[in-house]
């Protein structure tokens, strides 16, 4: 595999950088916070393990990939950007369409986490319901932020493990969101019910058309 893999210090460094970065935005406190953050951290470790440590996905599909792309060095680092290979991007994969899209999703996901945390922290401090900022558009921007980041990394470097983990983590976040909503309803009652009627859970509403 040459010098492209077996770079375990990079696995550790990159995992820590993104985990600490996410931690600085989310600052988990409740058990729900820690569960969502722990699952997200596991996804990042699995991702960077294949990106820099051992390319399990490429190894398992090496026969098929070699037949389909006979001129590609499968175990070079650039070949790990599988979507760029599969869709015939001939240039540097770091500037390919999927990689650029991944930057957008990952970047926006972290911005959403940061903005959501500021509102949520203030609401918890004052024992009020978070309804401003990102919470004015959707009820669970923190989970949407995690999902956007994971989806962005999947576009950049898809692996068997992360592709399998992604739907499970989305399902877990939906369950955590429902548990949080049950507690919020008990705590805030009618205020929460009114908020739910006006604000979707995960996907923001399109702006209504202005009548003539």
What kind of feature is each model-predicted range?
Residues 1-131, 149-183, 187-212:
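Membrane-anchoring alpha-helices and their flanking helix-loop junctions
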Residues 137-144:
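Histidine-centered phosphotransfer motif of kinases
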């Amino acid at each position: 595999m040459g010098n492209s893999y077996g770079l375990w210090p990079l696995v550790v460094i990159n995992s820590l950088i993104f985990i600490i970065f996410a931690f600085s935005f989310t600052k988990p406190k409740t058990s729900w916070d820690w569960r969502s953050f722990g699952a997200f951290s596991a996804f990042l470790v699995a991702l960077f393990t294949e990106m820099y440590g051992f390319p399990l996905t490429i190894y398992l599909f090496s026969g098929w990939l070699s037949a389909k792309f006979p001129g590609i060095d499968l175990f070079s680092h650039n070949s790990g950007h599988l979507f760029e290979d599969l869709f015939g991007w001939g240039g540097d994969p770091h500037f390919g369409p999927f990689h650029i899209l991944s930057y957008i999703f990952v970047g926006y996901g972290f911005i959403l986490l940061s903005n959501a945390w500021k509102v949520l922290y203030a609401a918890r401090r004052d024992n009020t319901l978070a309804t401003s900022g990102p919470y004015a558009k959707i009820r669970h921007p923190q989970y949407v932020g995690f999902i956007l980041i994971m989806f962005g990394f999947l576009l950049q470097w898809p692996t068997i493990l992360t592709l399998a983990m992604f739907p499970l983590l989305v399902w877990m976040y939906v369950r955590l969101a429902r548990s949080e909503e049950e507690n919020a309803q008990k705590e805030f009652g009618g205020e929460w019910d009114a908020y739910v009627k006006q604000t979707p859970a995960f996907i923001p509403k399109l702006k209504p058309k202005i009548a003539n």
